């Protein structure tokens, strides 16, 4: 009967949760918001890639009239952010991770006194955080901090800006 088939499929799906899951897909929110995918390459190493839109207040350094000027501004960015991570399982489903990666995408400089300027964005970042993997459900929750450096390039104005690029984020992912 249909009930037996559904029950059997449900039992198989739940039993799959008892084996090691190497893939996680979900959402990341905070300093940027979007989709997150994590692939365990071995017991302790993973690649995590986020495709996200972010908004942040940052400091920007630029060269004006032969002197270095530091200013603060708002950035709206759309990036892909792959990271290589070392994962260490602690106890009771809690794990810690650290690593680094890069970000590539577009950034929109938003300033009250000027029109928005679009930049190509290229950066490097560190990543440190902790997570919790549920024992009975195929879900993980994580918090992380990603300090970094970004170059913002604008061809029209022949400008290169340097920015402190940071994100604090929370994520939830489905494991499979």
Where are the language model's segments positioned?
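Solvent-exposed loop/turn segments connecting transmembrane beta-strands
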Residues: 22-36, 74-75, 92, 152-163
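Outer-membrane beta-barrel pore domains and translocons
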Residues: 30-32, 52-54, 101-105, 144-150, ...
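Sec/Tat signal peptide C-region and signal peptidase I cleavage site
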Residues: 6, 16-22
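Gram-negative (and chloroplast) outer-membrane scaffold detector with strong preference
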Residues: 39-143
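Positively charged n-region of N-terminal signal peptides that target proteins for export
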Residues: 1-5
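A generic structural motif
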Residues: 7, 32, 42-44
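Repetitive helical segments and hydrophobic/amphipathic motifs
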Residues: 12-13
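Outer-membrane beta-barrel "beta-signal"
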Residues: 164-176
């Amino acid at each position: 009967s249909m009930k037996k088939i559904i029950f059997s499929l449900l039992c198989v799906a739940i039993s799959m949760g008892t084996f090691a899951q190497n893939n996680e897909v979900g959402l990341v929110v905070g300093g940027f918001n979007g989709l997150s995918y994590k692939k365990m390459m071995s017991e302790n190493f993973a690649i995590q890639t986020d495709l996200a839109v972010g908004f942040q207040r940052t400091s920007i350094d630029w060269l004006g009239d032969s002197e270095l000027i530091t200013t603060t501004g708002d950035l709206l960015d759309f990036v892909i952010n792959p990271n290589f991570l070392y994962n260490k399982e602690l106890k009771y489903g809690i794990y810690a991770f650290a690593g680094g990666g890069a970000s590539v995408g577009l950034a929109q400089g938003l300033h009250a006194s000027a029109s928005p300027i679009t930049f190509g964005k290229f950066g490097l970042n560190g990543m440190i955080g902790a997570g919790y993997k549920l024992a009975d459900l195929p879900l993980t929750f994580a918090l992380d901090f990603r300090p970094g450096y970004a170059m913002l390039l604008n061809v029209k104005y022949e400008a290169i800006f340097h920015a402190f690029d940071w994100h604090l984020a929370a994520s939830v992912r489905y494991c499979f």
